[in-house]
Amino acid sequence: MARATPGMSGADLANLVNEAALFAVRRGSKQVERIDFENARDRVVMGARRESLVLSAEEKRATAIHEGGHAILTVVLPNSDPLHKVTILPRGMALGVTWSLPEERHTYSKEYFDDMICRAMGGRVAEKIVFGHLNSGAANDLEQATSIARRMVRELSLIHISEPTRPY
């Protein structure tokens, strides 16, 4: 559980324990079990399941292809964190989620960030390969990749941008 909750504060962990207790009560159990903690962690980290959201078969397929693209790259990229879970059940504001568990490290290589950008774009690439076009569902992935690249340039100096040469 500790590995699946990196960066959580004491208050975040207390909230997670309370959520786990609620899941146990809903199951009719007097004991909080591992499954309750896993469900609570998913709810806290990925958002509540949106069971009322009904997707068409086409939307479900597109979401599966998209999340599959993220998952494949998470597994094959050499500097990627290990894949933990993939779901096409809508959670929070997302139609699907691919979740990796970050390994504990104190420094990150340029290659690690490069792979993060590739993973973020994996859903878009999968959609383009399978459907031949993109849809609006990947907008957050583009924002994430842009944010990582911007951080690599502005804060970490991992990419050097030179002035464009002028012909005059």
How would you name each of these model-derived features?
Residues 1-12:
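A short helix-loop-helix "switch/interaction" segment in the helical subdomain of ASCE P-loop NTPases
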Residues 163-168:
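Short "domain-exit" segments at the C-terminal end of structured domains
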